[in-house]
Curated annotation (Swiss-Prot):
Gene3D superfamilies: Holliday junction resolvase RusA. The keyword NAD does not apply. Belongs to the RusA family. Keywords: Endonuclease, Hydrolase, Nuclease. This is Uncharacterized protein PD_1345. GO terms for biological process: DNA recombination; DNA repair. One of its GO terms (molecular function) is endonuclease activity.
Amino acid sequence: MSKAMPMAACAMAGVKQMQSLTLPWPSKDLSPNARVHWTRRSKAVKQARGYAEVMARRAGWSGLSLPVEGRLDLWISFYPPTRCLPDDDNMLARFKPYRDGIADALGIDDRRFVSHPLIEDEVRHAGQVVITITGITQQASNGGPRLHAHPAF
């Protein structure tokens, strides 16, 4: 289901889909519910952000030619390590350092991302997060979002 949503959005707008980036399940120390010392949390944030940046660069995302304005749709599929499904708001908070690292690799501010989180039912060993960036979203004249095709996608 997670793959269908980005592809459907791309097909409607005539936007090509970027390749996916797979990252490990975020550390429990990044959870807003975690009761850990601030230095431990800070270390987990730094490690996750750096790892996401390196992996995004290895995937070739740093060489993309992005427009100066517009928002990027960030499709995030969370594949939990167990059948116990986490809350999507908790997972977005745990994902934030990854999001920052991807933005660092792209050379943009992470506020340009429009997040589309999906907690998958499929269990994957050790858990995974699959990220796909699809289109450029800009505000339409009627106030609603619209997708624009861009040659980089």
